[in-house]
Curated annotation (Swiss-Prot):
This is Inter-alpha-trypsin inhibitor heavy chain H4. One of its GO terms (biological process) is response to cytokine. Interacts (via C-terminus) with DNAJC1 (via SANT 2 domain); this interaction protects ITIH4 against cleavage by kallikrein in vitro. The keyword Signal applies. It comes from Homo sapiens. The keyword Signal applies. Disulfide bonds join 747-925. Glycans are attached at residues 81, 207, 274, 517, 577, 719-720, 722. Residues 272-432 form the VWFA domain. GO terms for molecular function: endopeptidase inhibitor activity; serine-type endopeptidase inhibitor activity. Type II acute-phase protein (APP) involved in inflammatory responses to trauma. May also play a role in liver development or regeneration.
Length: 930
């Protein structure tokens, strides 16, 4: 937070809204500004979302306060209106041509003030901000409206809402209404802030075509605890859904003289691909980037279809092909390519031009030799993190060279790694050649971002798709021809109907399959469609015209990227005129925020461009770097030790950090090797403590270096303590409630199993659990849970949890709150890091990353009475008929279990129960090693 300016007597408080409001300071009691009402109303009609955010604040202080309204909205959205109501007067935002607003913007910059109200934040969001002075006891109402067309990606439409009030709000309500005439096929919600107290505040109602999601927490539900006046709301609320569809010409919807045509047919066979991966391995890709690229590339290669052909080109100063020509994606070739990808090292310059021309030549030669399968699709996928530095370095020349070489025969997709990449260069390179560009954000999930992008283009269904409508029925149609349709995506065409057109709108959609052309026919009654969109009371009306304008502007702006210089101005003029006519804040317009006469009139809202990100000081991760920029002391570089990784010097954003455990020290930490029979992970023990040697200790017989002497004494004392102290109680790898028992449990460790293990499977439950056990760590290195209905994969590792559905993967860090509800499955994770996978009809499976002794993943089961009689697996076998042997005469703490004809020894032991999360509770259980 910036300090108050000396010339003003008022203090400053931020009110940050992210769809809901976000108050970025402390509570109202301290600052005087109180958000007493926050509402968001989002109405989605046929994928077009109209969102209104309203915040009402009051200044309860005795002095003037400055309130800053700040909210986040999706990058693809256009702001359409902003207003403030102060003392009964409405002060609207006025949308103007950007050049017209430039004078006000420049005047503000000349005064050293921040005039831009919108800036990029994070990956897919932009931040809107405006400030105003608030008199004592005065009330202000802020209202912001924006609109967007939800894009189908990997079979899902997604609406993202950030929830971060940072103070308790008396009236906090969020309503999302969805109306889809095609029918809603599934609906799911996910949040990263939900607690057990908040579950009842989120309600979902759904019928065939409508859905209503409401979030309305009470004051007590918002509190972290009854004793704290701080809010627990801090995270994302995500709504995902899809609609019913069939093999048809799509769905035509009509309202108020405009129409929209959605096309995403089901049941088409995926076309074979010819894929050339062009991978940057220049020096700037070293470290985490190249590591994640290798990881993603290996998994992408595994996803290739046997019908596909592929090759790899890696480049730095020079470009190199993995194989002389395209090779089939056979198991043998994929395994060899995986080995090659695993050995890619980063070094040298960036020769993009030669690498791209080599990729085109590779496809050309295969085409000339008739080695491309009939009806196949040829793709080039480029991954780079920087500007060209070797060979041809002029971006325009490279774009021209590639465009001439491709000549419209192949599709090029460009992935820009990080914020230093020239995104504008890559975007034009891709759009010139029938593809698209995507920024890969440098983060812990970069490999997943790469894999998800590949999944978007991995399954082409149709090529050369064209939409045709009767000339006497429509006018002003948006783009109606497309190069490729991919599985999980959707083509959208919108237009205006003729005033006296026919009563029925017909459409013909044609495209190419691998071996034949295909034509779809569809029609829609104008009168019936008009009536359908007028009937729902809670869906906003006259949206279709705005959808058409929104889509037209987006496409015109995209066309300017690859248009010639002569055509660019005409395209911009068309987009500008529509932006002004429909009050959209786009890259060509600005919104001037008006204020009372006694306040400065210098704030202007402009739409950021994706290509401008490299010039903006934006940090999408934590606020660590921002903290140091504000003058805080930077800690000295320090080191930490992990039982799993050993010594590690952790680099922070502005320096390094060190984690010391007072009084804990091992010989390895002092720079000496541990004993040869002690594995690396045992060199450090969290329970060891160094005792002070008594003053009467006998003198040494020689005079070694004092530092060495201290080390020797410490090591001797540590060894002595280890032999005298009982081994600490450990957490088992898996905790299994015994069938028919309410208290007794099995604590199971599969110590004698090697490689991936089928832990349990139940075909009637539709669940399977596999994992890999590491004997040295006495825990699992990974666990994967597969559900058949819904089809979901949950892969847990010590780093994070990855959830995959509809070929789309999302990563979640341990101990981050998660609450996801979909038909047939609920996933929850709290701050302890306990992940629960449950459903009223399913066994509950719990996963936990245990970072205590025996670091690794842990597994637990609940509601095991729901297992069917067909359950099996290393752990599942204990839910078949289990026979207990009689206690040994001399020791009732030992029993024998007979399961499926095999005997297992069970010992009564004290273990740590982690079913409620760390640090665990000591329990007595029957311990079994498998």
């Amino acid at each position: 937070m910036k300090p108050p300016r000396p010339v003003r007597t008022c203090s400053k408080v931020l009110v940050l809204l992210s769809l809901l409001a976000i108050h970025q300071t402390t509570t109202a009691e301290k600052n005087g500004i109180d958000i007493y009402s926050l509402t968001v109303d989002s109405r989605v009609s046929s994928r077009f979302a109209h969102t209104v955010v309203t915040s009402r604040v009051v200044n309860r202080a005795n002095t003037v306060q400055e309130a800053t309204f700040q909210m986040e909205l999706p990058k693809k959205a256009f702001i359409t209106n902003f207003s403030m109501i102060i003392d009964g007067m409405t002060y609207p935002g006025i949308i103007k041509e950007k050049a017209e607003a430039q004078a006000q913007y420049s005047a503000a910059v000349a005064k050293g003030k921040s005039a831009g109200l919108v800036k990029a934040t994070g990956r897919n969001m932009e931040q809107f901000q405006v400030s105003v002075s608030v008199a004592p006891n005065a009330k202000i109402t802020f209202e912001l409206v924006y609109e967007e067309l939800l894009k189908r990606r990997l079979g899902v439409y997604e609406l993202l809402l950030k929830v971060r009030p940072q103070q308790l709000v008396k009236h906090l309500q969020m309503d999302i209404h969805i109306f889809e005439p095609q029918g809603i096929s599934f609906l799911e919600t996910e949040s990263t802030f939900m607690t057990n107290q908040l579950v009842d505040a989120l309600t979902t109602w759904q019928n065939k075509t409508k859905a209503h999601i409401r979030f309305k927490p009470t004051l007590s539900q918002q509190q972290k605890s009854p004793e704290q006046q701080e809010t627990v709301l801090d995270g994302n609320l995500i709504i995902r859904y899809d609609v019913d569809r069939a093999i048809s010409g799509g769905s035509i919807q009509i309202e108020n003289g405009y129409f929209v045509h959605y096309f995403a047919p089901e049941g088409l066979t995926t076309m074979p691909k010819n894929v050339v991966f062009v991978i940057d391995k220049s020096g700037s890709m070293s470290g985490r980037k190249i590591q994640q690229t290798r990881e993603a590339l290996i998994k992408i290669l595994d996803d290739l279809s046997p019908r596909d052909q592929f090759n790899l080109i890696v480049f730095s100063t020079e470009a190199t092909q993995w194989r002389p020509s395209l090779v089939p994606a056979s198991a043998e070739n994929v395994n060899k390519a995986r080995s090659f990808a695993a050995g890619i090292q980063a070094l040298g310059g960036t020769n993009i031009n030669d690498a791209m021309l080599m990729a085109v030549q590779l496809l050309d030669s295969s085409n000339q030799e008739e080695r491309l399968p009939e009806g196949s699709v040829s793709l080039i996928i480029l991954l780079t993190d920087g500007d060209p530095t070797v060979g041809e370095t002029n971006p325009r020349s490279i774009q021209n060279n590639v465009r001439e070489a491709v000549s419209g025969r192949y599709s090029l997709f460009c992935l820009g790694f990080g914020f230093d990449v020239s995104y504008a260069f890559l975007e034009k390179l891709a759009l010139d050649n029938g593809g698209l560009a995507r920024r890969i954000h440098e983060d812990s999930d970069s490999a997943l971002q790469l894999q998800d992008f590949y999944q978007e283009v991995a399954n082409p269904l149709l090529t050369a798709v064209t939409f045709e409508y009767p000339s006497n029925a429509v006018e002003e149609v948006t783009q109606n021809n497309f190069r490729l349709l991919f599985k999980g995506s959707e083509m959208v065409v919108a237009g205006k109907l003729q005033d006296r057109g026919p009563d029925v709108l017909t459409a013909t959609v044609s495209g190419k399959l691998p071996t034949q052309n295909i034509t779809f026919q569809t029609e829609s009654s104008v009168a019936e469609q008009e009536a359908e969109f007028q009937s729902p009371k809670y869906i906003f009306h006259n949206f279709m015209e705005r959808l058409w304008a929104y889509l037209t502007i987006q496409q015109l702006l995209e066309q300017t990227v690859s248009a010639s210089d002569a055509d660019q101005q005409a395209l911009r003029n068309q987009a500008l005129n529509l932006s002004l006519a429909y009050s959209f804040v786009t890259p060509l317009t600005s919104m001037v925020v008006t204020k009372p006469d006694d306040q400065e009139q210098s704030q202007v809202a402009e739409k950021p461009m994706e290509g401008e990100s490299r010039n903006r000081n934006v940090h999408s991760g934590s606020t660590f770097f921002k903290y140091y920029l504000q003058g805080a002391k930077i800690p000295k570089p320090e080191a930490s030790f992990s039982p799993r990784r050993g010594w590690n010097r952790q680099a922070g954003a502005a320096g390094s950090r060190m984690n010391f455990r007072p009084g804990v020290l091992s010989s390895r930490q002092l720079g000496l090797p541990g004993p040869p029979d002690v594995p690396d992970h045992a060199a450090y023990h969290p329970f060891r403590r160094l005792a002070i040697l008594p003053a009467s200790a006998p003198p040494a017989t020689s005079n070694p270096d004092p530092a060495v002497s201290r080390v020797m004494n410490m090591k001797i004392e540590e060894t002595t303590m280890t032999t005298q102290t009982p081994a600490p109680i450990q957490a088992p790898s898996a905790i299994l409630p015994l069938p028919g028992q309410s208290v007794e449990r099995l604590c199971v460790d599969p110590r004698h199993r090697q490689g991936p293990v089928n832990l349990l499977s139940d075909p009637e439950q539709g669940v399977e659990v596999t994992g890999q056990y590491e004997r040295e760590k006495a825990g699992f290195s990974w666990i994967e849970v597969t559900f058949k209905n819904p089809l979901v994969w949950v892969h847990a590792s010590p780093e994070h949890v990855v959830v995959t559905r509809n070929r789309r993967s999302s990563a979640y860090k341990w101990k981050e709150t998660l609450f996801s509800v979909m038909p047939g499955l609920k996933m929850t994770m709290d701050k302890t890091g306990l992940l629960l996978l449950s459903d009223p009809d399913k066994v509950t499976i719990g996963l936990l990353f245990w970072d205590g002794r025996g670091e690794g993943l842990r597994l637990l089961l609940r509601d095991t009475d729901r297992f069917s009689s067909h359950v099996g697996g290393t752990l599942g076998q204990f839910y078949q008929e289990v026979l207990w042997g009689s206690p040994a005469a001399s020791d009732d703490g030992r029993r024998t279990l007979r399961v499926q004809g095999n005997d297992h020894s069970a010992t009564r032991e004290r273990r740590l129960d982690y079913q409620e999360g760390p640090p665990g509770v000591e329990i007595s259980c029957w311990s079994v090693e498998l």
